[in-house]
């Protein structure tokens, strides 16, 4: 609590030049442990995009084409992705089937990237520019990491890093299975609380690792929880002094050009990666409270 209060009090000192890019993973839907390609996918997409349209903010969405392409067909998936494009999203590649690079043969993983851009390219009418690693796993060895980076460059891709990592998928799964409105409200309230705590944490950690606050990139998922919470999340970002920018604009920050050599069987924020690459110990972000983690473990076991 003292940590949060400190940064909320200290907020005005750093608020003037803050920027954040909103990036959304697992399109057309993901993060809440339900059928990603349900018959209501069109309605869900409209609900999810409504607060983003209303706020008029830029955002990016990273697509897993595979499952929904198989269940819905190319034409229906294209219609869904066209809604995202028409709402202003920059559509990126999150692979076809969301494999873990750390335990997938390279050639198979690379093929999955190419397979994951097929419908997206039809919708955008242009090459797909950005790639987001599934699970944020970038390789267990430096050789694996560099091989993927080289392959992506050769195919015209820019890696889409994230600096503000979030456990939104945990809250989203609980929210999708809440037994009543009271439980849903409790989950929503704690989700919004921890999201602001995470912003405060990564703002401070950026200053410690990089010397100043980077133009942040926040990761969330295309879930019903975020469809319901986006107005509050956007308001929180603005209250903290953020200007919401495109991913392209955020990546103009020269700090993103700093090399990082972190390799492990973990998917973590790039702020942690840069720190570890400098030999700094990782200071982990706040966890959800015990009741959230225990409920999630019970649900997925």
Predicted regions and their residues:
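Compositionally biased, intrinsically disordered low-complexity regions
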Residues: 10-15, 298
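Sec-dependent N-terminal signal peptides
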Residues: 2-12
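Short, basic, helix/turn surface patches
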Residues: 85-93, 119-126, 183-202, 268-288, ...
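Noncatalytic linker/hinge segments flanking ATPase motor cores
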Residues: 61-66, 100-105, 131-137, 171-175, ...
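Short alpha-helix boundary/capping motifs
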Residues: 80-81, 112, 144, 179-181, ...
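Active-site beta->alpha N-cap acidic-glycine motif
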Residues: 16-136, 218, 236, 252
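Catalytic domains of cell-wall/extracellular-matrix polysaccharide-remodeling enzymes
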Residues: 69-76, 97-243, 249
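C-terminal domain-boundary segment and adjacent tail
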Residues: 54-56, 161, 222-301
């Amino acid at each position: 609590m003292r940590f949060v209060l400190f940064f909320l009090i200290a907020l005005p000192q750093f608020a003037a030049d803050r920027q954040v890019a909103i990036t959304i993973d697992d399109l057309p839907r993901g993060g809440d442990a339900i059928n990603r390609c349900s018959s209501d996918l069109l309605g869900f997409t409209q609900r999810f995009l409504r607060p983003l349209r209303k706020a008029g903010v830029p955002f990016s969405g990273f697509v897993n084409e595979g499952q929904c392409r198989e269940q819905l067909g190319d034409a229906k998936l294209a219609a869904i992705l066209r809604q995202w494009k028409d709402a202003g999203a920059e559509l990126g590649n999150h692979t076809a089937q969301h494999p873990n690079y750390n335990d997938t043969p390279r050639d198979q993983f690379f093929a999955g990237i190419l397979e994951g851009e097929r419908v997206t390219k039809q919708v955008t009418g242009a090459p797909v520019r950005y790639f987001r690693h599934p699970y944020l796993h970038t390789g267990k060895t430096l050789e694996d990491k560099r091989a993927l980076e080289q392959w992506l460059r050769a195919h015209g891709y820019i890696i889409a890093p994230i600096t503000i990592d979030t456990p939104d998928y945990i809250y989203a799964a609980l929210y999708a299975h809440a037994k009543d409105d009271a439980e849903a409200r409790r989950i929503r309230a704690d989700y919004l609380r921890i999201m602001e705590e995470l912003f405060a944490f990564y703002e401070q950690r950026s200053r410690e690792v990089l010397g100043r606050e980077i133009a942040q990139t926040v990761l969330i998922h295309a879930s019903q929880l975020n469809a319901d919470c986006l107005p509050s999340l956007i308001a929180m970002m603005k209250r903290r002094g953020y200007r919401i920018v495109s991913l392209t604009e955020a990546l103009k920050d020269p700090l993103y050009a700093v090399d990082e050599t972190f390799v492990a069987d973990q998917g973590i924020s790039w702020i942690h990666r840069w720190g570890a690459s400098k030999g700094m110990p990782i200071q982990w972000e706040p966890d959800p409270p015990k009741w959230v983690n225990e409920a999630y473990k019970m649900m997925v076991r």
